[in-house]
């Protein structure tokens, strides 16, 4: 992660042109004592957006955050024909917007590249998307929780696409595995879909809510045994 995705570049004997343009390396392969650096986050983010029908062509894109993932998202958006890419920062520099200014940006797509909303700070949301009419998609690269507060608010607002970053995480790892093994994995899209589905089953919980004596504990223990999951009773915690 940042800052290591940038710092590691000075130790690489070869840097893939895409990684060099982005300014970040997330995959390093030792080939006969020489370190080769690549960026698979680009492919992972592109896969995530393609899988959910996020179309950058002709759109104004608002990127929250200024770290290495910002550069990756910016590269994908520009390569796919975004008409304008705007950056939002808590401490805006030249050419950047503050969060207070973001609502008036006229953006159709918002991408969060900050840790805001990541576990354990799951209730954090830096941007009030309810004041942004015309939004078509909200993408959050955070994958834990599977739906951040930003994604949940986007769903509540009826924005057509509201998605977290789990598929990006899996996809970039699938492409990285290809570099580690010396050849691309067969059908990376299918591999990504399969692994993502398995991870979602592991990550998502079953929550039982009801009045005292309704049978939550009994049903919960039975479900936990059948699903091979840990049972948690908040009355006992």
Regions found by a protein language model. Give the residues of each.
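Short beta-strand-centered segment that lines the nucleotide-binding/catalytic pocket of NTP-utilizing
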Residues: 229-237
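Adenosine-phosphate binding glycine-rich loop
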Residues: 141-203
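NAD(P)-binding Rossmann-fold cofactor-contacting core
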Residues: 79-97, 235
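Phosphate/diphosphate ligand-binding glycine-rich loop within oxidoreductases
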Residues: 1-52, 145, 153, 157, ...
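Conserved lysine of the Walker
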Residues: 216
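Rossmann-like adenosine-cofactor binding region
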Residues: 95-162
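Glycine-rich adenosine-cofactor-binding loop
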Residues: 37-42, 49-50, 54, 58-78, ...
